Amino acid sequence: ITHDLAVVAQMADRIKVLLKGDEVETSDTASMLSAPQEDYTKSLWAVRSFRTEPKALPQQEKPLLELRNSCASYGQHPVLHDVSLSLYRGQTLAVIGESGSGKSSTARLITGLLPPTYGEVLYDGQPLPADFRQRSKEQLRRIQMIYQIPDTALNPRQRIVDIIGRPLTFYLGLKGKAMRARVAELLEMIELDPAIYMERQPRELSGGQKQRICIARALAADPQLIICDEVTSALDQLVAEGVLKLLNRIQQQLGVAYLFITHDVATVRAIADEVLVMQRGRVVDHGSRQQIFTPPHQDYTGLLFSSEPQMDPDWLDRLLASRTPQTSNPSLEKV
């Protein structure tokens, strides 16, 4: 049972497609992949073609966010080694790597949850305190985060108006009618009807709708930078595409910058302007989307890309046959 179509292509003999509890169609894998009969199935198969257009950003003298030679540890265990990155206003920087590569630790360092043992974090050219508890309310407001699992990020007992309204009150001082009016605007921005959703609780929403609420809550603080930590990994591919399109539209409207933490190559290919590749806590590759995806690849980057499952039943067999003992990497078995 999965929403990952590429995994289905490798593992299944037959495929059953469901929509809202009803069977859409059932067939053997080869037939389903090559010639789906129903429109819904065809739409599922087509989602991996989404791409944003490269942005022509204005020349900027300094990055919005900069990490300089940052190192960090959990106790005696080092997790980041000499990590540097730059992110500009209105730009999307994707940080990609396998599990344990340091992606989420980088996000924790930026947000002040993981103090660096060396190096510094600069925001708009000014050093940020290493510990979030030492940061001003204004510094906290400017950097917001959208988490991987909305069910753990949203208070199940609160109404949507309270969830989105809290940062409006905390950061901007909005209360009462002014707060509710702004919540309604934010719901419209994420394409949810305020009249329907404002008084609901998270348990009454679908997974995609919950993630949109998380987006609205982040936007409520009026941030300049949003860190997106695996924001589509818990969603089926059709819903995930809708979330990526929404984030792209919001960026075009507001000029917000995104730091995308992901292990999904398709997401990077779809939305990134710049790409940072991490392995074992180090940056091993960096460049524009075009540069990173144009061969020849750096060795580890090439291994990551070749490990991206394809909607082809023979893909895994071909991949395993192509990997010799000299070029295989056991650490990528989970990718």
Regions found by a protein language model. Give the residues of each.
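A short, surface-exposed alpha-helical micro-motif characterized by mixed small hydrophobic
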Residues: 8-10, 268-270
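Conserved catalytic motifs of ABC-family nucleotide-binding domains
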Residues: 222
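Conserved ABC ATPase signature
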Residues: 201-205, 209
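Conserved ABC transporter NBD signature motif
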Residues: 119-130, 139
